[in-house]
């Protein structure tokens, strides 16, 4: 089974990458910890930990005060907006910080819902995380009609014909995930945005799962909104929303009277998590530094981020192929999602399986005892597990690969699964 680890580790400098993450040195029951649980939250580099600690030591204050630590807090927040602007390909004042993607999406659904009523329609998909489903489905209480797009069960992809057929002149918003957090499918979001705009509807993209695996460019997508979570791309537990400036200024958020009416601050409820915002800049700079090590001639942050993802995509794809090919040799195993390596440009290295005779929880528990961290369940993609009729039996065993994972970890996982199944 060929791999490209040697070549790609040179391009990515895998030794340097792994040295940035202190958690990768952990052991469990004498086994090196292998973090294959990244779809639920990635590990963080030391610089993120340091940035959070440094803020609390030297800059801890509320905003807009007439003194040094408050000034520094303002500067740290502005710096993080600039960093996320480079990460997303947008202006800093189009970046909104929040508790998480779920709370940001509820806030936006409430604001957009103020303008909707009977006769209006919203298009959702059965592939999405519930955080990009339930906040919009709740608008049915206002008389809004909810249209649900089906999936192709054979490969867990969106039925694009069904999606196109459900968008019409009454459609006001189409919400879709960039990539499935359960089975790894990468959706054709650019086409979804085009279809939405052709009908005069807004396009809302959940990029939480895609963000650590590929470059984001909201200008190229022309989406109206895009949300992600920094703890899924090597940062602290926070949510980030991009909104076109025209929408952030026009829509009316629910907010406190004392809150500024200026955008993007008008969308940020209460006091933000300033220390985690400091960590966001550090995690974006980490990704950019990967790109600078790939191509030392690059200095600017946005080009460096793109260079990093160019290599991350190739490396993760090689790991994904090795894992998928290996899983298909395990008796009684069933892989959910795209399994043909020739189509892996349409999937993230997030693998969901079931193995006859073993519940996902049993498998995850036994793997965890060997230092192999995986997830079991539905991962809040409840519509998908119900459609595939696996919810009643514990959902899937999910394994997620990231650029800090190695071929050795993939091989350890496969050996462990074979031994567990053979007993």
Ranges and model annotations:
Residues 1-423:
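Pyridoxal 5′-phosphate
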């Amino acid at each position: 089974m060929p791999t490209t680890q040697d070549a790609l580790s040179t391009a990515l400098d895998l030794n340097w990458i792994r040295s940035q993450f202190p958690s990768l040195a952990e052991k469990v029951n004498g086994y090196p910890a292998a973090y294959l649980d990244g779809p639920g939250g990635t590990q963080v580099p030391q610089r993120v930990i340091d940035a959070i600690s440094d803020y609390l030591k030297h800059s801890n204050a509320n905003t807009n005060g007439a003194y040094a630590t408050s000034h520094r807090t303002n500067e740290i927040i502005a710096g993080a907006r600039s960093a996320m602007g480079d990460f997303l390909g947008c202006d800093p004042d189009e970046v909104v910080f929040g508790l998480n993607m779920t709370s940001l999406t509820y806030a936006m659904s409430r604001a957009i819902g103020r303008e909707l009523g009977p006769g209006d329609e919203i298009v959702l998909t059965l592939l999405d995380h519930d955080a990009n489903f339930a906040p919009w489905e709740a608008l049915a209480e206002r008389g809004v009609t909810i249209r649900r797009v089906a999936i192709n069960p054979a490969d867990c992809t969106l039925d694009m014909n069904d999606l196109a057929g459900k968008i019409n002149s009454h459609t006001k918003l189409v919400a879709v995930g960039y990539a499935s957090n359960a089975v790894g499918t990468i959706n054709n979001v650019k086409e979804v945005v085009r279809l939405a705009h052709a009908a005069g509807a807004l396009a809302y993209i959940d990029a939480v799962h895609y963000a650590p695996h590929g470059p984001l460019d909201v200008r190229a997508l022309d989406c109206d909104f895009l949300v992600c979570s920094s703890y899924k791309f090597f940062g602290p537990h926070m949510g980030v929303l991009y909104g076109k400036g025209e929408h952030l200024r026009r829509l009316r958020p629910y907010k406190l009277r004392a809150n500024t009416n200026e955008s993007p601050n008008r969308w940020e409820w209460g006091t933000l998590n300033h220390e985690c915002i400091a960590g966001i800049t550090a995690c974006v700079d980490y990704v950019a530094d990967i790109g600078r090590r790939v191509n030392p001639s690059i200095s600017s942050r946005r080009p460096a981020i793109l260079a990093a993802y160019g290599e991350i995509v190739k490396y993760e794809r090689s790991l994904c192929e090795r894992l998928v090919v290996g899983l298909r040799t395990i008796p009684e195993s069933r892989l959910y999602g795209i399994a043909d390596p020739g189509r892996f440009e349409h999937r993230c290295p997030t693998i969901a399986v079931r193995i006859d005779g073993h519940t996902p929880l049993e498998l995850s528990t036994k793997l965890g005892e060997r230092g192999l961290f995986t997830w079991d369940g539905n991962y809040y993609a409840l519509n998908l597990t119900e459609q595939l009729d696996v919810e009643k039996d514990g959902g899937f065993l999910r394994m997620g690969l990231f650029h800090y994972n190695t071929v050795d970890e993939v091989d350890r996982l496969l050996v462990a699964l074979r031994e567990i199944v053979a007993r």
